[in-house]
Amino acid sequence: MTLSESQERAARIKLLLMDCDGVLTDGRIWVLDEGGDQKTFHTRDGLGIELLHRAGLKSGIISGRTSDAVERRARGLGMSFVRQGCEEKRKAFAETLREADVTNAEVAFIGDDLNDIPLMLQSGLGVAVADAAPEVRERAHYVTNER
């Protein structure tokens, strides 16, 4: 896909959805002795999401895992949708689009792993992070330059 085609797709976007682990984090999960886990988020992602909201777009997370840290980070960033523990991400995706009152063409989805491919393919703009699985990068409309 050419840059201009990606830009045309991006111009229609009203909602940005993303996986969390490997997209908003480096993909590592620190399992704590006392139970639970710990994740590290980058401030640049937070600023980008804040700017996205200022431009009038909404955002959200669809994740197969469940984490209190993800919930806190998403709410702290003002994300409209947080779907965790999604064994069937496509169902959560469809529910989110209905709730947001947007079409597939008006959604961008950022992913990094194989279970993100169906959502990327259903989206108007499917984005893979730079260090995504090769199969994910191959199917993306756009691949980021950096993680």
Report each predicted region and the residues it spans.
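Mg2+-dependent phosphoryl-transfer enzymes with acidic/Ser/Thr/Gly-rich catalytic loops
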Residues: G35-K39, A69, G76-L77, F81-R83, ...
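Short coil/turn segments at beta-strand junctions that form active-site/ligand-binding loops
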Residues: R12-K14, L57, A105-E106
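Substrate-recognition element of Asp-dependent hydrolases with the DxDx(T/V) motif
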Residues: I49-R73, Q84
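A positional/architectural concept
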Residues: L24-R54, S63
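Non-catalytic pre-domain segments flanking phosphatase-related domains
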Residues: M1-M18
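Generic enzyme active-site microenvironment
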Residues: L17-D19, I110-G111
